[in-house]
Amino acid sequence: MLAIVLAVWFLFFNKKNSAVQEEKAKPIVVSNHSDAFNQSLAPVMATYYAMTTGFVNWDTTAVGKAAQQLKTALDSVKITEIQKDTAIYESALGPLDNIKTELAGLMGETTIEKKREDFNMVSQNLYDFLRTIRFDESKLYFQECPMAFDDEKPGNWLSKEVESNNPYLGTKHPKYGSTMLSCGEPKDTLNFMAVDTIKK
């Protein structure tokens, strides 16, 4: 009887110990940037996505609101947090300033067509900025629609999903309706998420 009890205890202990070891070996994501910097970028991405959704839905009110919030978020980016790497810091300043300039232009336009032209430039410069700083909070897709402008010129945007949710043709296009909502595909993928394979 004692032998059976010892055998059961041994099996239970080994199983529990294996589970602990498996948990310790589970990969975790480690950012190369400070928490302050990452936290200051979170509202930038959130408001950019909200603006993208506004364009998808042909909702200029939502676009305008998100653009104003994005402007506020951009002004609050703690860019000096990456100043220790001079090359990255100096290279990031140009795209960051360009985003602000293009966003101001977008907010000043009266038609959604013109706003989309500025949105395209905002997206291009945001992509350049995130690629320069090696944004590592999430995986991003730089999407491209080949017929965003007049059915012949491309337009780009950033997305967390690989599937296209097209902000240029959207759900209420005068010619296509919502049939071209999925038009587009990733032109590039930003994935700088670092993985530490040993959890301490």
Segments predicted by a language model, with ranges:
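Intrinsically disordered, low-complexity terminal tails/loops enriched in metal-binding residues
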Residues: 1-200
